[in-house]
C-alpha cells in the first residue's frame, strides 16, 4: 500500500501517515524517512486479535483507515481466516495479515479491525 509519512510521533520510530483510505499511526521499521515521503509499505498487526471484540462487522461500503484515541481502525473486507487463526483484511488492492482467535465470522463482508500496535515495513519493489 502506498503511504505518505506526514510527521513523526512521540515514541521511538513512530510516524503518522496518510493513504488513499485515510490516516493512521505506526512504528516505522525501515531506514529513517522524513515527513512528506511517499513509499509502498506492508502493515503488520502484531497483536493477537479477538473476533467479535477487536474485529467487528460494520455496515460500511468503503475502505477506511482512521485514528480513534490510542487505536488505529482499519475498515476493509474480511477475505479469509485460516484454521490457524491467520486472517486477511482487504484494503483496496492490499491485504493486511493478522492473527486472531474466537467464534467464526462471515467472510467477504466489511469489518473494522481495531489495533494499538501497527508496524510499518517498506516494500522493496
What spans do the regions from the language model cover?
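Structural detector for short beta-strands of small beta-barrel domains
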Residues: 1-10, 60-83, 109-113
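Flexible glycine-rich surface loops and low-complexity tracts that mediate binding to linear polymers
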Residues: 3-6, 36-50, 76, 108-125
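Generic structural motif
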Residues: 6-8, 20-22, 31, 46-48, ...
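Acidic (E/D-rich), amphipathic helical modules within compact regulatory domains
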Residues: 12-57
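Short aromatic-glycine-enriched beta-strand elements
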Residues: 12-15, 83-89
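Beta-strand/loop nucleic-acid-binding surfaces
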Residues: 18-34, 90-109, 114-119
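Intrinsically disordered, low-complexity acidic/polar segments
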Residues: 26, 50-52, 85, 98, ...
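Short, compositionally biased
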Residues: 52-68, 124-125
